[in-house]
Amino acid sequence: MITLYNTLTRQKEPFEPLEPGKVKMYVCGPTVYNYIHIGNARPAINYDVVRRYFEYKGYDVNYVSNFTDVDDKLIKRSKELNESVPEIADRYIQAFYEDTGALNVKKATSNPRVMNHMDDIIEFIKDLVDKGYAYESGGDVYFRTRKFEGYGKLSHQSIDDLKVGARIESGEQKEDALDFTLWKKAKPGEISWDSPFGKGRPGWHIECSVMAYNELGETIDIHAGGSDLQFPHHENEIAQSEAHNHAPFANYWMHNGFINIDNEKMSKSLGNFVLVHDIIKEVDPDVLRFFMISVHYRSPINYNMELVESAKSGLERIRNSYQAIEEREAIATDIEDQSEYIEQIDQLLAQFEKVMDDDFNTANAITTWYDLAKLANKYVLENTTSKKVIERFKEVFQIFSDVLGIPLKGKQQDELLDEDIEALIEERNEARKNKDFARADEIRDQLKAQNIILEDTAQGVRFKRG
């Protein structure tokens, strides 16, 4: 059974869907005013793996992820570029598909856009006003936060805690500093829509509530996003949605950890804002994805090139092992006396499912994949190989690949390049120096499986191709 950590209850819980065999999942998507940065890429990749694992377990997943195409950032960008907001949004939505496609993120079942739901948003706000949960003031519409009794339950804060530091900004006409905006009065020169409250545009929080409601219904199974969205965005979504629907908004809340750049928070002011569009010109997108899932989704992750290179090395180990298995397939026989390998492969598959069942622990899943690669390296050194064993290796390698979204072959994977071999030899030398003989032997076996022979000489270790 799959268990996942629920931010709402602060504990791991068995997953019990609203409808047997189906998952309704909503993931907060990007504001499309620029190319996505790696902070946007992390949830896209992490929750893609969650979706893939649910599908592997037989679930039908309705995966919805929105585009915020009406926002202060878009309006600012529109003025800077002298382009319309829809033009900018269209361009960066296309860029999003290109970048996430390169990262092997499956397309969502639906990617709703705010502009396409404007009538729905206005009706939703009208309902909240009619029920007394919202009020008009000076052309804006605000949500009465205190009227919603459960406010703070996701971020585990009380109203009194939240009141400290709450301020009414200049120009706002709120009843209470804790109230938040549902509809913003139009400003000269800004994109706007007609509404019963006057010309304006929606606030950020109401957009996701409405799109989730229209796409997935009153209650959804899983709502996911970055940790930075937990408060106030997701907290406000709950308040709006449950006030409107009179039903729980989401049964499970998932939040992924932050990304730091060289141990510093990513920010434009620090000049370390890293766009996926730029990274994948230098780093293989498969390696970037492998790096992203090498850490549990709830943990923070530190991005630097040393760690990315380590991920590249790890992925190469797996791919080289799979390639070696494929190469032995042509000379495999029908022998039946190697069942112990089948048993070990199946044990590793069971281990993979066990760690993925435990809150989608991709870090441990990758460790299991390394173990499978290590077993494969050992097997290809056998004098004779079995078709059944080779086939089972290939099946399980493919399962791991499909679930984690990491292709077993690079886009141009041929034989190992000389510089790759030299890098492995250097890694082996370091392992031997550190008395990590198991890793040293593993590298030797990996190279041997690729018909690369190591020779110790007075000048150091050399290699030759067999």
UniProtKB/Swiss-Prot annotation:
Q: Predominant location of this chain?
A: cytoplasm
EC number(s)?
6.1.1.16
Q: Which gene encodes it?
A: cysS
Give the UniProt family note.
Belongs to the class-I aminoacyl-tRNA synthetase family.
| Entry-linked NCBIfam families | cysS (TIGR00435)
Q: Report a single Gene Ontology molecular function.
A: cysteine-tRNA ligase activity
Alphabetic keyword roster: Aminoacyl-tRNA synthetase, ATP-binding, Cytoplasm, Ligase, Metal-binding, Nucleotide-binding, Protein biosynthesis, Zinc
Family matches, as HAMAP family: Cys_tRNA_synth
The subcellular location is: Cytoplasm
Recite the UniProt cofactor note for this protein. Binds 1 zinc ion per subunit.
- Give residue numbers for sequence motif 'KMSKS' region: 265-269
Q: What reaction is this protein's catalytic activity?
A: tRNA(Cys) + L-cysteine + ATP = L-cysteinyl-tRNA(Cys) + AMP + diphosphate
GO biological process terms, alphabetically, are: cysteinyl-tRNA aminoacylation
Q: How does it assemble?
A: Monomer.
Annotated positions binding Zn(2+): C28, C208, H233, E237
Q: Which SUPFAM superfamilies match?
A: Anticodon-binding domain of a subclass of class I aminoacyl-tRNA synthetases, Nucleotidylyl transferase
Any one GO CC term of this protein is:
cytosol
Query: What name appears for this protein in its UniProt entry?
Result: Cysteine--tRNA ligase
This protein's species is Staphylococcus carnosus (strain TM300)
The sequence motif named 'HIGH' region is recorded at 30-40
